[in-house]
UniProtKB/Swiss-Prot annotation:
Entry binding sites for Zn(2+): 591, 595, 695, 699
Highest taxon listed in the record's lineage: Archaea
Family according to the record: Belongs to the class-II aminoacyl-tRNA synthetase family.
Record-linked NCBIfam families: A-tRNA_syn_arch, alaS
EC number: 6.1.1.7
Listed name of the protein: Alanine--tRNA ligase
Organism field: Methanosphaera stadtmanae (strain ATCC 43021 / DSM 3091 / JCM 11832 / MCB-3)
Amino acid sequence: MTYELEQLGYKKQVCQKCGNTFWSIRERATCGDAPCDEYEFIGNPVTDKQYDLMGIQKKFKGFFKDHGHTPINRYPVLAKRWRNDVFLVGASIYDFQPWVTSGMVRPPANPLVVAQPSIRLNDVDNVGRTGRHMTCFTMGAHHAFNTDETPIYWKNETLRYCHEFLVSIGINPEEITYIESWWKGGGNEGPSFEICAHGVELATLVFIQYATTKDGLKEIPLKIVDTGYGLERIAWVSQGTPTAYDATFGSVIDKLTDISGVELNTEILSENARIAGMMDIEDISDLKLLRKKVADKLSLDPDMLKKTTAPMEAIYIVADHTRCLSFMLADGIIPSNVKEGYLARLVLRRTVKYMNELGLNESLSDIMKMQVDYLSKTYPEIKDNKDHIINITDLEEERYHTTLTKGKNLVKRSIKTLKKQNKKSFPTDMLINFYDSHGIPPETVEAISKENAFDANIPDNFYTQIAAAHEEEEEEEIEEMELNFPKTKLSFYDDLKQRTFTAKVLGVVDSNKIILNQTIYYPEGGGQPSDIGTITRVNGEVLNITYAQKVDGIVLHHVAKEDESKLDNIVGEEITGEIDSKRRDLLTRNHTATHLVIASAREVLGKHIWQAGAQKGLDKTRIDLSHYKRISHEEVQEIERLANKRVQENHPVNIQWYDRTDAEVKYGFKLYQGGIVPGKNIRVVEIPGIDVQACAGTHCEKTGDIGVIKLLRTERVQDGVERLEYAVSDSGIKKIQDDDDIIRNSSDVFGVDAEQLPRTCKRFFNEWKEQQKRIKSLEKQLAQVKIFSLENEIANINGYNVITEVLDVDNNQLREIAINLVEKEEVADIAILINNNGNIVASSNNKILEKGMKMGDVVNDIGKFLGGRGGGKPTLAQGAKMTDLSRKDEAFESVKEQIRSWN
């Protein structure tokens, strides 16, 4: 492993500070990495020319292209496009997990080079403060995937490439060190090197060659060169700027300082970065120690330093977060309260928070425009999504401000509750609940707490804790069924028109599930229900099949309960199967229609549209789409028009099996709209020029076979997900006819033609509203008359005017009379009124409340006599089901007795 280093003149040494083994050309006491060595490049660039991020990315890819590597385009930062275990890409190797790294699928090129934007939110609280931490960074990587049959290159070549690249940009080889290490993760491990120069780590070279097992390390057949070069850091050392942010964000920083009026103090920033580089900030949640060290070094008061650095840190945070957001939103993440959408919203709201701290008058979308324009020089696909990004940020910023307004009252109420419990600060889980469930950021909690003399107790690493809790997809536990049978041949793929078949029975499990060697029964999957039908034995007995299920490639045919007794001695028998043809045809049309609806929705609503779930049905089908706002009626109509236009155009529906890598190279990750399909080979369903998906379902030969698509309704199923329901073919026609019947019947009721129905309904509705106004006016007059008649019934008890009556009025009048007697007319201090329906209203003024009598208690006390209950505010409460009015006098007297007892 070290042969190449020796050839390059490197000698093995041991760091006198950390004890790590490293390699260096010159003799040195330390390993070259922080905290053993201080940053030496700040104010002193160490390359032959200065590179911005775009420049070093071009240089990196060009170098490795010249050395036999195929450049590939970046993958989306949304890893869920091709894998189920994580939400976001955290390193370039994520691009190739699990399919390539498992050896199941060949890589898109071998060897290859990629500059992969990666997102890690585990240090989000350190961004802007240390000079180097970022939420989004570009990992330059060259990868090689080696097998015994096809070796590409391994350790020596990897070390040589790294050395030659760093030297090619002007870094003195005598300043480069290679620190020996060991990498472990994701069930694999192997030796590695951390490459440092001038006090900063620039790259990591990992050689994945072992599987981690309970019995120790086991060599794996696929040996992977997994490298990661920090391109932002390389740009930083080439420029020698005070922070990595200055080297990375270019004109975005300049524009932010211009509009905010913030001046960047290079002396403070440089010293802060140097000292932060000497500290293991990742393990320090409280950054006060860093601030103290910087203050001591510069002979400044720590509080004054914090005040000085806060706006500079905010500039860097806004620049970093808007870059992260640009990739997130351009790659299809919709901010929401769950999964990857939660992480996007977290970053977005932190951005707005720091914009507010800077006192910016600009909107978030104004800042995003700056970032999008800057990034688009390297990533044109981001500019293609500019309108979408701006629409989302405008909407999300508005939602954020609405959330803050609503949330303040919740925080105030919580403070009162905690004070009553003699608590002096918020527990962390309550702060997390404020943020997770109500969207209230800790800074808002802190501000309200100060106003109410309460300790917010916000952890320094609050956002890091939040992000860590939401970064990985929760694995769904599936109860496995062990089946020792060969996989079932899915014969319906050979001929989708086949409706009968013959097969051999291989076994029966759980007394009611038949396993065959082959089948045309479609097993439930991809949102498509299974086929149903019959299996006929050689003796003529017919078994009804109610459900087909696939487990690890084996199809289980569920037999109806009433036919389970017919399964004796069936194993080994040749049977005849038949599926319900009408059901299959309708589900087939529904499935192809779903592809058209998705494609039409994407054209109408935007490229961000992605399937979040689907369920095909006989009467109606639904599709869930990632979208950031409600779908309007006009948009629904346009989606329906487009989908039916494509039905009428009678496009071919092409179905073909592809090698997974070939399919991804040809079509991209839009293949996985309907979910991630496993396997080396995938079945691709393409409607040319309209839609393409990896799909295992049954489909029409042409779109014209669908007949008609009728959109029924939309629904918001969760934050960031919109549902479309629609009916297809005969079900669609029936829905159109049902709607026509409703219109015709309504027209008959009003005695007008259908064209006049909207105008007639509007006229009747307006007349009804006018009648309601008149009725309410008359009710008020009747209530006033009733009030006058009740004044003679008021009793003075112990100095308080009390009225208790049963009235023949409706609920609304009852409430109005009770309130007016106390508040408007002021003839009673307390009014307790019941109507013949058993409703009760109790109203009082502050004189009664000051004696400790609350109307909610009064209503429930009376309910003990009359059988009902209720509740409300201290001076106004309501109740119902006071049905035992024979005890009304007894109930009223109990209240009067309390009043008599007052001193």
